[in-house]
């Protein structure tokens, strides 16, 4: 992952010497991009979850169904 490698490179450099203003801005932008990707992955994972009780009935929370609809996994 190029973004994560660059984030780590800047973090290691920051431990040795102060970052320039441009490097700080790059670091902030990279971190925001990385967090956005992770959030997207988590939402995708949660939107495909199905919760079943011990009896075998689907008890998936409505919020998960809303996520599925929002991301196009189901159609109403």
Curated annotation (Swiss-Prot):
It holds the Pfam family DUF896. It comes from the Bacteria. Its main location: cytoplasm. This is UPF0291 protein SAV2573. InterPro entries: DUF896. SUPFAM superfamilies: YnzC-like. Belongs to the UPF0291 family. Keywords: Cytoplasm. It comes from Staphylococcus aureus (strain Mu50 / ATCC 700699). The lineage of its organism: Bacteria, Bacillati, Bacillota, Bacilli, Bacillales. It is found in: Cytoplasm. One of its GO terms (cellular component) is cytoplasm.
């Amino acid at each position: 992952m190029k973004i994560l490698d660059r984030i780590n490179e800047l973090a290691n450099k920051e431990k040795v010497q102060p970052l320039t203003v441009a490097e700080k801005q790059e670091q902030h932008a990279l971190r925001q991009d990385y967090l956005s990707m992770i959030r997207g992955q988590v939402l995708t994972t949660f939107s495909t979850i199905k919760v079943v009780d011990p009896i075998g009935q689907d008890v998936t929370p409505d919020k998960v169904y809303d996520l599925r609809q929002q991301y196009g996994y189901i159609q109403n």
